[in-house]
């Protein structure tokens, strides 16, 4: 987990505000903007929340008493809420001391199963990518933008999800080759796609078991990656389905784990 102790000055924090310093100059408490990813019960009234913050990376903190009816900020710490959060630095887990709501994304997508499912996959992916990342601002901004789009219903949820996964993986350094051969650089388009080899591959480099999508499916993914929504939404349904499968395999391969919420989504 990225620890807030690395933010020792206002300039280093890039907008985050340390509100108290220890005698040795390290941050004793801090304030930051974050989006809640998950929450788990702790004891009778507390909850452990995982928050992806703008400047402090992935934070796990105890929110005391939030499950009580009269809690001051219990509903503000539900998954997908964008909040201004203040925490005290703890030995193992930080302690939430104050929360102000910025945007209530959870309220906008909670009644839409497809949107909620897509947001769950986004949150799980963001957590996996940033667990060992000390600098997470690009991933934070990308996630906030994607969840805000879901909340507004700007695009079909599955297309929004695929676009987010492609972009999140690319920001993390795992951008797929969608035209030229990922192995030898031979000009494309190519028919085969291998997550293990980096994306599209030519017939000479194609490994056994490579996916064989139509080239239009790769064009669809390129449109999602670049934000060409007119082309993406106009793609044939078969190409969208093939593209979703490629994106799922790509993300799972590079994260070295199955995305549990994505597996649930694909079974529905």
PLM segments and residue spans:
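Non-catalytic alpha-helical scaffolds and adjoining flexible linkers that form interface surfaces
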Residues: 17-268
